Structures are given as structure tokens and as C-alpha cells.
């Protein structure tokens, strides 16, 4: 099912959406934070999906617990380290870990730039102990508004040499992408690549805006592109990567069933699309789970799954020499 001669990658993976249940438990007790359960076993349903959640709101409530325990920068460093460990232990050759420093900082009023530094330090420590390739993507969380995103951007750009790209995440209906055109001009001027969550809660126009105005060369989720034939044609022609996260889309009710997921439609249209975990800690999944879903629920053949693996490597924010090195390591 997974082709061992092709690098296995996960490009849409939120660092702040992958905090271990036992880490939430330990940090909560260490810092005197009231948790919603009185044992490790009973905590899991509050922070991980049990079956299918009914809405994005229910999903996000679980996600919020993952940052609620980030009481100091050591906690941030710990979860960054554990993210590297989890990526390696799940069999990934390469992962891009994205994180929103404002979201991670807000509960305990941590310094935004300090959060960025702690993430970088935690990842560096993890890379010393685990055999995996990792790059970082900074997120601007638009749900908190333009001024918050400016703070977030400045904290991230202060360490731009440790980032490969910037992302726009959050409420795309309430905070459309055009509110952040100036933010992304600064991102482009800094020489970073751009991806954006779009076409998930909003329609295809959100994706057009992300590509044409923000400068996105990849789109997170993008499920609503299938309703716009011109956009589908554009995506295929210009090799705009779709970071697809089928299980997450089901858990947030972006799609009502795997049968309704548009992954196959993208494949048949020749769109560059890859499989990703999104918030693996919340969904309680790993990348191999997504490949099983793609085979047994979405109906992809082993040859098509191999193409999806290759797509992921092509979409990755890597230089050609780095891409070749990933393949060489599998030879």
C-alpha cells in the first residue's frame, strides 16, 4: 500500500494539533491547570475524536486543550520535540510542521517570538535524536484579526531562516484572505513560500484569491474547487498543490462521508494532490491511516497511491537537491 521506494511525506500537519494525551495530562498537573477529566484514560475523549464529530466547533474544542497546557516556553519546546519524535515513529521520511505562535501563546500570555524560538529549539533537539527530515511553516491565524496576525508575522519573520513557508489558517468566512494581502506581500518579500487554508469553509473564490493575491502555490484542503471547472483546470495546469486531509475533513464535517470526499475527482482531473494528517493528535491518526483510507474508502489503487506519494515529494517546499536526497535515501 505504501511504496517503500518512494519518500513518505506529510505536508499539512499542525504542530499545535499534535500534542500527546499523556503530555496534556502531565503539563496540566505540572502547572495546576484544571483538566476536564480526573484520569489519563478519561481525558482522551475530551482531546481526541471518538468516532465522527458533528462540527468544526466540536473539533476545535479538542484542539484548544492542546494549547491550553502550554504554560511556559519549556512546554512549547517539549511538544515541538515530541512532534519530531512522532513524525519519525510514524514512518515519515519528511514532514512540514506548521504552527501558529499567537494561538500557542494566547492562553498564558507567552511572548510570541519566544514561542517561535521554543518551537525551533524543540525541533532541533528532536532532530538530534530521531532520523527524519523536518521543515517549519509559520501560520497566521486570521480568526484573531489583522493586528494579531501582524504580531504573529513579525515574530515569525524574526526567525525566517528557520521557516520554509507561511500559511493563513482559521475562519475563512469571517476573515477572507483579502484582509491579509499586505501581510503576504511581506512574506513574499522575505522570500518564503506560501500555502493557505482555502476552499474548506468558503467557496472556490477563496482559493482564487489565495493563489492570485496572496501568492499561494499550495492550498490546504481546497475541497470546494471541484465546483469550479476553470479553477480545476488552472490547478492542474499550474501544478498548484492540494494538501488533502480526508480524515480531518470527515471529522470536521467538511464532508459528510468518505464516499463524498473529492480526492478522486482531483486525481482524475490531473491536479497535484497529496495525503496529509492535519491535526493527527486530535484525529488520533497517523499518515499510514490516511493511506489505508485512500485505498479502502476512496478506492485508490496501489499505483495511484504511489503517485500520491510522488505528488507529496513534488509539492514539498524543498530545493531540487533536497528532493533528490530524499529519493536517494530510499534507494
Swiss-Prot record:
Positions with a binding annotation for Zn(2+): 12, 14, 197, 278
Per the record, the GO terms for biological process are:
adenosine catabolic process; hypoxanthine salvage; inosine biosynthetic process; nucleotide metabolic process; purine ribonucleoside monophosphate biosynthetic process
According to its UniProt record, the EC number is 3.5.4.4
Cofactor binding notes: Binds 1 zinc ion per subunit.
Q: Name one GO cellular component term.
A: cytosol
Query: According to the UniProt record, which cysteines are disulfide-bonded?
Result: none
Q: Please give the catalytic activity noted in the UniProt record.
A: adenosine + H2O + H(+) = inosine + NH4(+); 2'-deoxyadenosine + H2O + H(+) = 2'-deoxyinosine + NH4(+)
Record-annotated active site = 200 (proton donor)
Residues flagged as site, Important for catalytic activity: 221
The chain's coiled-coil residues are none
Q: Which PANTHER family match?
A: ADENOSINE DEAMINASE
What is this protein's function per UniProt? Catalyzes the hydrolytic deamination of adenosine and 2-deoxyadenosine.
Record-given protein name = Adenosine deaminase
Organism for this UniProt entry: Shewanella oneidensis (strain ATCC 700550 / JCM 31522 / CIP 106686 / LMG 19005 / NCIMB 14063 / MR-1)
Amino acid at each position: 500500500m505504501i511504496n517503500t521506494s518512494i519518500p513518505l511525506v506529510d505536508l499539512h500537519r499542525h504542530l499545535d494539533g499534535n500534542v500527546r494525551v499523556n503530555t496534556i495530562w502531565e503539563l496540566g498537573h505540572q502547572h495546576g491547570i484544571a483538566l476536564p477529566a480526573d484520569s489519563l484514560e478519561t481525558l482522551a475523549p475530551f482531546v481526541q475524536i471518538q468516532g465522527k464529530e458533528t462540527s468544526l466547533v466540536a473539533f476545535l474544542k479538542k484542539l484548544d486543550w492542546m494549547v491550553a497546557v502550554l504554560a511556559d516556553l519549556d512546554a512549547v519546546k517539549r511538544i515541538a520535540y515530541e512532534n519530531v519524535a512522532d513524525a519519525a515513529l510514524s514512518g515519515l521520511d519528511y514532514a512540514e510542521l506548521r504552527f501558529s505562535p499567537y494561538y500557542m501563546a494566547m492562553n498564558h500570555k507567552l511572548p510570541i517570538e519566544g514561542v517561535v524560538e521554543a518551537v525551533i529549539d524543540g525541533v532541533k533537539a528532536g532532530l538530534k535524536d530521531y532520523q527524519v527530515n523536518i521543515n517549519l511553516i509559520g501560520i497566521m491565524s486570521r480568526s484573531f484579526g489583522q493586528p494579531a496576525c501582524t504580531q504573529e508575522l513579525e515574530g515569525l519573520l524574526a526567525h525566517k531562516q528557520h521557516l520554509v513557508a507561511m500559511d493563513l489558517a482559521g475562519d475563512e468566512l469571517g476573515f477572507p484572505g483579502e484582509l491579509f494581502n499586505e501581510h503576504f506581500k511581506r512574506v513574499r518579500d522575505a522570500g518564503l513560500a506560501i500555502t493557505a487554508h482555502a476552499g474548506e469553509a468558503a467557496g472556490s473564490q477563496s482559493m482564487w484569491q489565495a493563489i492570485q493575491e496572496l501568492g499561494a502555490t499550495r492550498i490546504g484542503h481546497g475541497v470546494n474547487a471541484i465546483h469550479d471547472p476553470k479553477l480545476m483546470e488552472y490547478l492542474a495546469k499550474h501544478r498548484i498543490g492540494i494538501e488533502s486531509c480526508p480524515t480531518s475533513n470527515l471529522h470536521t464535517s467538511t464532508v459528510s462521508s468518505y464516499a463524498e470526499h473529492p480526492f478522486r475527482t482531483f486525481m482524475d482531473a490531473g491536479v497535484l494532490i497529496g495525503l496529509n494528517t492535519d491535526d493527527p493528535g486530535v484525529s488520533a491518526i497517523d499518515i499510514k491511516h490516511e493511506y489505508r483510507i485512500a485505498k479502502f474508502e476512496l478506492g485508490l489503487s496501489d499505483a495511484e497511491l504511489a503517485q500520491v506519494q510522488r505528488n507529496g515529494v513534488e509539492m514539498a517546499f524543498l530545493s531540487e537537491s533536497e528532493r533528490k536526497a530524499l529519493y536517494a535515501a530510499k534507494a
